[in-house]
Amino acid sequence: GDGGAVVTHDPALAERVRMLRQYGWRQRYVSDIVGLNSRLDEIQAAILTVKLKALDEDNMRRRAIAERYRAELQAVPVVLPGDPPGGKHVYHQYVMQCGGQRDELGRYLRQHEIGTAVLYPIPIHQQPAYAERFAGVSLPVTEKLARTILCLPIYPELTDEAVDSVAEAINRFYAK
């Protein structure tokens, strides 16, 4: 499943996050703000406790995979992710912009047994749940990204050989 954590030195932010995770409660059964039930159960917490011990190592491995993709895909007409100014990307996802050939590339990679994903193909402002609130809104950059992004495999256990296979397949696709 999905999970997450918030780390902060700001006591006010920490308090707000604690409230948001459990119905907006500052005290039991009193919702001071609108919140959700997004607490981890015991099993999820136990798994997270083990996984947190490997977080730095896993992040370093994903960064190494991203650097390998960057080195091997520099000749193809895609936009690859990188570190934000003043920051350090951990590559939870490896999202590249493929332009108008996203769907064709995705099919090609799947034909070569390479898993890909298209995350959030429908922008929030075009979701039925928000139709009334965002009626008539045009967000051309968001809409373009929804049509052009493709996620490549990236997880700590991915071997260098597998990364090379993904990159080779992408290079072959764009060479034809």
What function would you assign to each model-found segment?
Residues 1-6:
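Glycine-rich phosphate-binding loop of ATP-grasp-fold ATP-dependent ligases
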Residues 9-176:
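PLP-dependent aminotransferase class I/II
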